[in-house]
Amino acid sequence: MKFLIKKIYIILFLLSILLIESKIFAKESEIQYTKENISNYFSGIISINQNYNNKAFKHLKKVKSLKNKHSRFNIEFIRTLILLEKFEQAFAFSKSVWTDDELFFEIDLLLGLDYFIKKDYTNAEKHFERLNKAARYNPFFDDIIGDVLIAWSEASQGNKENSLKYLEKIRKPYLHLKKIQNIFLQCYFNDSHTQKSFEELIHNNDYNFSRYNFFLTNYLLFNNKIMEAKKVIKNSRKEYNSNLLIKQTENFFLNNENEKIKNFFNCKNPNDSLAEFFYVIANLYSSEKDYKLSNFYMKISLFLNNKFLPNKALLAENYYYQKKNKLSKNIYQSIKSIGPVYSWYASKSIATILLDVKGKKYSIRSLENEFNLLSNPNFEHYYELANFYKDNEYYEKSIKYYS
């Protein structure tokens, strides 16, 4: 791999010499294709492909003079800014390169979101409409993103009929996304059918909607239906025993921490519903192993709703598969504050990272220490620690915890 990168640099260096000496590039008065600019540009692209976002930003920001001449630079720079959570810089840069006669999905997406957050819905919709025209740059989701965003722009202005009209445009195979957003719109507009729609969704066998037991619970709590909310979680725990969000919600109820459930999400805030929409997109890209694009949408989701900390688990998982162990470990460490369910899950995940980085002994010691800190370990804790011992060939210890 190192040999390949070195070879690429040599080729790029030779290319840069040719470009500098070219009369064609010499005539360009607005931009200078110097050896340093070309080197920084290609170093930035290589860093992006290797998932080194900070390094990519360092190189690309040195060649911002390319922005008016090199459209690919604009896209890569904007994506890098988002991955580094530099949203204000991303908004400003997008404004500086936007033109009416060019369609760039990421630029119109960010400008539309910026206007939407500032409640300038006319300008927001102008950019969201352009997303549909630029769908060829984002074929995985066709024009669904533009339609959902316009639906919420219309909803934010009190136009229920118009908002539902845009959702109706969504076709197969994205009907599951349409159903989710339709229910959130019902909730936003105080529709009396909201609870029934949630119940139909979570019992739908065409798709795994187990996650939305949490959102039904959240909705019931906001409507002071506490006993019904507890019943939803109790029933869903039986059916979806391994779902972290449901398990943690049950734990919140057991400790009378109902407000924590409400703090994650509020259907009266359009930003929260859009954050869930982008989370689902990020999840779909992750399932396709496109972790870079998944992270891009995940960062947007967290920007819109930074209260929904459980969603960070997807980001940590993506980083792990990208072999960005330090970033993954840091995020797992941060989600421990959510509650004991996520804390134990994070501890197991960190132990797995340490297994790759420092070996069995260090990894097992780490998980043992976390286990010993548990105030009231249950059957699942013992069973999962025993499994970890077994998987790492500590058979005698595993037998002890199995029994």
What does each model-found stretch correspond to?
Residues 21-77, 83, 91-92, 102-103, ...:
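N-terminal leader/linker segments that initiate helical-solenoid repeat arrays
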Residues 33, 67, 101, 135, ...:
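A structural motif in tetratricopeptide-repeat
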Residues 36, 70, 104, 138, ...:
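Residue-level recognition of tetratricopeptide repeat
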Residues 49, 83, 117, 156, ...:
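Register position in tetratricopeptide repeats
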Residues 57, 61, 87-99, 123-135, ...:
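Alpha-helical repeat scaffolds
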Residues 73, 107, 141, 146, ...:
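TPR alpha-solenoid repeat register
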